[in-house]
Amino acid sequence: MTRMRLTIGVAVAGLALAASALAAPTATSVTVTAGKPSELRFTLSKKTVPAGAVTFKVTNKGTVIHDFKIAGKKTKMLAGGRSATLKVTLKKGKAAFLCTVPGHAAAGMKGTITVK
């Protein structure tokens, strides 16, 4: 009886391990700071991310309103001290991001992130 329980326990553990390996991968998280150290700049916590689901956690630490646009999606306009989360799916290559407030991208509030 003990041997049978052990065999069943090992089989169940193996199935659980296989199921977790097949589970959908979790999204990569990137912290984005707008407005600091310079008002018209973004600072990203990562310069490279794996292809797939990416969650951008955007915080405006400046005093001017900003948003964050990437892969055809964007956050709402964020006043100083406000935050938003943006979930996108990125393909391999370079993904461009920018602030859509008129004049901000031209002043340097844009960039790319490498997707591998």
Residues of each region from the PLM?
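Bacterial Sec-dependent N-terminal signal peptides
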Residues: 1-6
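N-terminal edge beta-strand
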Residues: 26-51
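Extracellular/periplasmic metallocenter environments
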Residues: 25-34, 79-116
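Short edge-strand/loop segments of extracellular domains
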Residues: 72-74, 115-116
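Beta-strand cores of secreted/periplasmic/IMS beta-sandwich domains, seen most often
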Residues: 45-64, 84-96
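Short, surface-exposed beta-strand/strand-loop-strand elements in extracellular ectodomains
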Residues: 65-72
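N-terminal post-signal-peptidase region of extra-cytosolic proteins
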Residues: 39-45, 72-73, 81-85
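Bacterial N-terminal signal peptides
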Residues: 9-20
